[in-house]
Each structure stands twice: as structure tokens, then as C-alpha cells.
């Protein structure tokens, strides 16, 4: 776990430590990194690390969770007063994850991209995440299942897109996602 910081200075220091972990993950697999190595590399005492995180996993979870929170501030690009739509929202989503290439590289290198998916679902189901307001008229379990389906699908697209080297532009990825969300998944009577 990690500390929920109460001051801006404390939050900045915590993010600095998270960036240190990400920097270490850019050249080493996550499992190879120890708290001692990380502290030595950042020239800080172990006590400083443990002031913010209970473990290395806590630092990783904080890094991912704070990245998810950064999405809220990520700017949307709309042309000529274009109104908000599924297409523009999803294009923003894919552009955001394209900008997070160093994190996606580090997670993939260490074989722990699944943690991003799990934390993304948890974030979406929390009161903090925008998707938590999705389908408010439905019972909690139905919302949970719908949100899990949507987040898993979108994050799987992001991870595959990243793994393949971003061969399609974000706008085209958004278009594909909109089609998946708005068109029948199965066609023809052979499926019925």
C-alpha cells in the first residue's frame, strides 16, 4: 500500500519516488529491483521510501494509480467546436495511453501489464473513477460487470496497440472501439 499524501510537498516527493521506480524499470525487470537498490540509486535513506510506501509493490501501485488519475487532466482535442462524443472521448483515452509509453514499456518488459488492467478496473469501480457513474440506474453488480467488461476490453486494446508499436493512429483506435461498443458483436444465424 501507499500513503495518501495531505500536502502538495509530500505528494510531489511521493511522485518523485514513483518516477524513480519507473526509471529503474526502464533498464531492469521489476523483480530484479530491490528497495535498497532503488534508494541507493535515488540517494535517499530507506526510511524515506517507507514513509510513503509499505513495499516496492506499494510504490508500483501508487505509480499506476496516479497515472490513472492523470487521465482526468489530459486535454481533449476537438476541432471547430466539435461536441463531445464516444469518438472524441476514446481518442483522448488512446492518446493518453500513447503518451504513457515509458510506463507501458516498463510493465511489458517485466511481464506485469496485468497489474495495470487490475488497477484500472479497481479505479473505474471506485468513487474516484468517471466510469463509476456509468449505468447508475442499474444495480451495483450489473454496473460492476459492465464496467469490468469495458475496462478490460479497452485496456487490452491499449496493451496490444502498444505491443505492436502503435501501428494505427489514436483516432483509428477510437473508431474501432466505438464500433465494438455500438455494433453487434456477432452476425449471422450460425451463432444462435
Model-found features: residue ranges?
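Helical hydrophobic small-molecule/effector-binding pocket
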Residues: 83-130
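Amphipathic alpha-helical packing segments from all-alpha helical-bundle domains
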Residues: 111-137, 141-156, 186
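Basic, helix-initiating cap at the start of DNA-binding domains
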Residues: 1-27, 32, 37, 41
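Short hydrophobic/aromatic patch on the recognition helix
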Residues: 43-53
